[in-house]
């Protein structure tokens, strides 16, 4: 999809851009694959805020996505490419020959009318899902499982891709979008191709109100708060933070401080750590 830019007819329009949605073929989702989605506003079951900067936004319905891709040996035809408000990637509605309908993540190059398939015998072509042991070395993949049968957990956002680098026994070596190289069980599944909607990262939100439509609330600087609200707060005027390193609102070091648990069980599968 192309980026649509606007003339500066107002302060909010100046610099703003949107996607032109040329790839989207319908604005009416499949009703049988919709589920209600209740807003949490960043609160847990006790009503306490656990995630800041969330709340409000346009009402949404959840699209049930097939991340498992476990419908083996049954071909399906791409019926539509649709917008999904719950993720950065677009989704594709698949009509299988046995009558079932499922949504999948729409990879780059997938078009209406194309046929896709899942299973060990599927061809190596965009949109097909196979066990990692059946995918040739060097192939670009997405929607990668970490546990067989659990469904894809890695490489699912717009424009994301990973590459299969090699095979060693029961494991395959995969380079992820972050630069991390890690081993994944060879019986886990992945989908061929790169996730579509590559231009998503080029969109300029343009104004605060558009962020609010997306359910994003303002991010207030700690230095603009009082000292009882943030370690950076207080002082006369624009005072320095008064500490040797930046802190989170709860007094923990931040901005570069590593938060991954030491000696985590999955460390042995990571060959090369991700880039900063």
From Swiss-Prot:
Pfam families named among the record's database cross-references: Ribosomal_L2, Ribosomal_L2_C
Region annotation Disordered: where it falls in the sequence = 36-58, 214-276
User: What keywords does the record list, in alphabetical order?
Assistant: Ribonucleoprotein, Ribosomal protein, RNA-binding, rRNA-binding
The molecular function GO annotations come to: rRNA binding; structural constituent of ribosome; transferase activity
GO biological process, any: cytoplasmic translation
Origin superkingdom: Bacteria
The cross-references to PROSITE patterns, in alphabetical order and at most eight, read: RIBOSOMAL_L2 (PS00467)
InterPro entries in the record, alphabetically? NA-bd_OB-fold (IPR012340), Rib_uL2_dom2 (IPR014722), Ribosomal_uL2 (IPR002171), Ribosomal_uL2_bac/org-type (IPR005880), Ribosomal_uL2_C (IPR022669), Ribosomal_uL2_CS (IPR022671), Ribosomal_uL2_dom3 (IPR014726), Ribosomal_uL2_RNA-bd_dom (IPR022666)
User: Subunit notes for this chain?
Assistant: Part of the 50S ribosomal subunit. Forms a bridge to the 30S subunit in the 70S ribosome.
Q: What does this protein do?
A: One of the primary rRNA binding proteins. Required for association of the 30S and 50S subunits to form the 70S ribosome, for tRNA binding and peptide bond formation. It has been suggested to have peptidyltransferase activity; this is somewhat controversial. Makes several contacts with the 16S rRNA in the 70S ribosome.
From the Swiss-Prot or TrEMBL record, give the protein name. Large ribosomal subunit protein uL2
User: What is the native source organism of this protein?
Assistant: Halalkalibacterium halodurans (strain ATCC BAA-125 / DSM 18197 / FERM 7344 / JCM 9153 / C-125) (Bacillus halodurans)
């Amino acid at each position: 999809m192309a980026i649509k830019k606007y003339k500066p007819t107002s302060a909010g329009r100046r610099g703003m851009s949107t996607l032109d949605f040329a790839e989207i073929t319908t604005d009416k989702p499949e009703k049988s694959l919709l589920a209600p989605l209740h807003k949490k506003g960043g609160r847990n079951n006790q009503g306490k805020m656990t995630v800041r900067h969330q709340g409000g936004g346009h009402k949404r319905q959840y699209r049930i996505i097939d991340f498992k891709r476990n419908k083996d040996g049954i071909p399906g035809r791409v019926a539509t490419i649709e917008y999904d408000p719950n993720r950065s990637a677009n989704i594709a509605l698949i009509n299988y020959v046995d009558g079932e309908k499922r949504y999948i993540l729409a990879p780059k190059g997938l078009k209406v009318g194309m046929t896709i398939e899942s299973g060990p015998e599927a061809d190596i072509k965009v949109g097909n899902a196979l066990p990692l042991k059946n995918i040739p070395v060097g192939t670009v993949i997405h929607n990668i499982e970490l546990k067989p049968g659990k469904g894809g957990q890695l490489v699912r956002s717009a424009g994301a891709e990973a590459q299969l680098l090699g095979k060693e026994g029961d494991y395959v070596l995969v380079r992820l979008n972050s630069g991390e190289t890690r081993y994944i069980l060879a019986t886990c599944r992945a989908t061929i191709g790169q996730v579509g909607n590559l231009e998503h990262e080029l969109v300029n939100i343009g104004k605060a109100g558009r962020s609010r439509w997306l359910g994003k609330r303002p991010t207030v600087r700690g230095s603009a708060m009082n000292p009882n609200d943030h370690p950076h707060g207080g002082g006369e005027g624009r005072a320095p933070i008064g500490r040797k390193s930046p802190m989170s609102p709860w007094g923990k070091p931040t901005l570069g401080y590593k938060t991954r648990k030491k000696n985590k069980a999955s460390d042995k599968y990571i060959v090369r750590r991700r880039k900063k």
